Curated annotation (Swiss-Prot):
CDD domains: Ribosomal_L11. It holds the Pfam family Ribosomal_L11. InterPro entries: Ribosomal_uL11, Ribosomal_uL11_bac-typ, Ribosomal_uL11_C, Ribosomal_uL11_C_sf, Ribosomal_uL11_N, Ribosomal_uL11_N_sf. SMART domains: RL11. Signal peptide: none annotated. One of its GO terms (cellular component) is cytosolic large ribosomal subunit. Belongs to the universal ribosomal protein uL11 family. Forms part of the ribosomal stalk which helps the ribosome interact with GTP-bound translation factors. The gene is rplK. This is Large ribosomal subunit protein uL11. Keywords: Methylation, Ribonucleoprotein, Ribosomal protein, RNA-binding, rRNA-binding. One or more lysine residues are methylated.
Length: 140
């Protein structure tokens, strides 16, 4: 028989840096989950991706056990890393803060493909280009 799901918790946690402090501790603690067990498992799973923000979906069951799924980093984080900028433009349509090539956008789209609802790579590239445009990053 399948376990009864109590809730799904969605968080964005820096890879390899999960610890019991907020926001992780309170989010898991209110559902009775062993926080340190999650932190150790998450840090082990995201070991090679230091410096990236990793979205995670934690499924909590009635017996206080849990499973979690890590997703790919947000497109905005990948674009900022590729363009080597700290943040996007305050006025995206007026001032451009960086340039990325279409090949770089295609690499990001390939990485993000499992989490995007795009049918093919071209649609995924257009999605990433839209994110870049809204951040003030020009695609060449």
């Amino acid at each position: 028989m399948a376990k009864k799901v109590v809730t799904n918790i969605k968080l964005q946690v820096p890879a390899g840096q999960a610890n019991p402090s907020p926001p992780i501790g309170p989010a898991l603690g209110q559902h009775g989950v062993n926080i340190m067990e999650f932190c150790k498992a998450f840090n082990a799973r995201t070991q090679g991706q230091e410096g990236m923000i990793i979205p995670v979906v934690i499924t909590v069951y009635a017996d206080r056990s849990f499973t979690f799924i890590t997703k790919t980093p947000p497109a905005a984080v990948l674009l900022k890393k590729t363009a080597q900028i700290a943040k996007g433009s305050n006025e995206p349509n007026r001032t451009k803060v960086a340039k990325v090539t279409r090949a770089q956008v295609e690499e990001i789209a390939k990485l993000k493909m499992p989490d995007l609802n795009a049918r093919d790579l071209d649609a995924a590239v257009l999605t990433i280009m839209g994110t870049a445009r809204s951040m003030g990053i020009e695609v060449e």
